[in-house]
């Protein structure tokens, strides 16, 4: 008899977890497209395996050695960064991070809502991350003065997040529709792990928000259990949830491509959001 997780896996049509055992993280590109930001790129030109093994020893030559080695002007226009610096009185830094951003739907929705925040999508899949970056460039060209604050990069967030962000740098961090890794033997690949929660807390400032959402109940329960056990986070209250514009977006199921798919299929999602509280991660 199939378990509920196996039924869910079949219903969603996800590839079998065994398919991603030996993924060459640089050799997985199926189609190459050089859009150069002239028009909105087409997703079909950026085909990609659905899964990557985050525990594989890939090659990540572009990973900064420390946050101060990361160049924001490699992703955002220098003039826009200078305007933010003038307004804020300090160097502009990324404050929102979408981990496993997929095709960047959330970034596009957040951009006009938070025009003064630098928003970064972080994606492990090479072609998908390239799509997000080119999509951002194309949107800037089609809408002058808009979408200046979003971009995407390729990285393994389970290994390198502190290489990009200083302690307390982020205001918001999103984990939306992460790979479920259904098999018990593969669950250590899930993005929310007890050992990693301290890293996420390190990057979030006190009062910052961590958002999780999934269409797999077992994964939702897993993430909630891990975060409930952490002394560095507390669940958002009902009042806080009702007042949060990001929660409103996520409840409607419209900001991400995966969320739109679930909504079209009349599926359910599990949303759990947490506030970073006082306390020092063990670093």
Model-derived segments and spans:
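Class I S-adenosyl-L-methionine
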Residues: 223-283
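Conserved SAM/SAH-binding beta-strand->alpha-helix loop
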Residues: 125
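Conserved beta-strand signature within the Rossmann-like core of class I S-adenosyl-L-methionine
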Residues: 206-214
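A short glycine-rich, Lys/Arg-flanked "PGG" loop and its adjoining helix->strand segment in the class I
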Residues: 192-206
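S-adenosyl-L-methionine
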Residues: 2-97, 105-114, 136-167
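Conserved SAM-binding loop
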Residues: 132
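Conserved S-adenosyl-L-methionine
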Residues: 100
């Amino acid at each position: 008899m199939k378990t509920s997780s196996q039924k869910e896996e079949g219903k969603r049509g996800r590839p079998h977890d065994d398919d991603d055992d030996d993924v060459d993280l640089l050799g997985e590109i199926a189609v190459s497209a050089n859009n150069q930001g002239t028009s909105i790129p087409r997703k079909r030109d950026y085909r990609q395996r659905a899964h990557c093994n985050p525990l594989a020893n890939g090659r990540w030559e572009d990973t900064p050695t420390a946050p101060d080695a990361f160049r924001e002007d490699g992703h955002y226009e220098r003039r826009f960064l200078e305007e933010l610096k003038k307004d804020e009185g300090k160097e502009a830094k990324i404050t929102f991070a979408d981990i496993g951003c997929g095709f960047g739907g959330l970034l596009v929705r957040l951009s006009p809502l938070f025009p003064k925040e630098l928003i970064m999508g972080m994606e492990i899949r090479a072609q998908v991350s390239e799509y997000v970056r080119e999509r951002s460039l194309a949107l800037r060209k089609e809408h002058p003065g808009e979408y200046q604050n979003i971009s995407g990069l390729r990285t393994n967030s389970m290994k390198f997040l502190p290489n990009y962000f200083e302690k307390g740098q982020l205001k918001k961090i999103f984990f939306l529709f992460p790979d479920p890794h259904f098999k018990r033997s593969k669950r250590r690949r899930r993005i929310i792990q007890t050992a990693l929660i301290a890293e996420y807390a390190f990057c979030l400032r006190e009062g910052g928000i961590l958002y999780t959402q999934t269409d797999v109940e077992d994964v939702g329960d897993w993430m909630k259990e891990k975060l409930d056990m952490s002394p560095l986070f507390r669940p958002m209250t009902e009042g806080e949830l009702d007042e949060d514009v990001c929660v409103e977006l996520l409840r409607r199921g419209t900001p991400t491509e995966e969320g739109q798919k679930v909504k079209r299929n009349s599926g359910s999602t599990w949303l759990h959001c947490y506030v970073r509280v006082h306390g020092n991660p063990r670093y």
